[in-house]
């Protein structure tokens, strides 16, 4: 995980932008396929504050939703609504 500095909106809501790396194996058409990729995330409020306190490099299970970065963007970003550190 790489993260930017915790910032606040004019309304006082905490915002944390970060990128994560996923490494996993899936089965597609009866063949195993290894996936390795980075993806962008954003967290708001208490989740952003808690995630900012986590050390880099810990395995995590993320929950949330995927949405365009902005209204007119074709780039996607995952909005983290919950996370759990896994060991």
Question: Residue spans of the language-model regions?
Answer:
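Single-stranded nucleic acid-binding surfaces, predominantly the OB-fold ssDNA-binding core
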Residues: 1-87
């Amino acid at each position: 995980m790489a993260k930017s500095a915790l910032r606040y909106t004019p309304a006082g809501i905490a915002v944390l932008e970060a990128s994560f790396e996923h490494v996993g194996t899936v089965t597609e058409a009866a063949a195993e396929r290894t996936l390795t990729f980075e993806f962008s995330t954003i967290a708001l409020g208490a989740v952003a504050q808690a995630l900012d306190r986590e050390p880099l490099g810990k395995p995590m299970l993320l929950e949330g939703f995927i949405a365009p970065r902005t209204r007119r963007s074709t780039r996607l970003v995952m909005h983290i609504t919950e996370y759990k550190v896994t060991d």
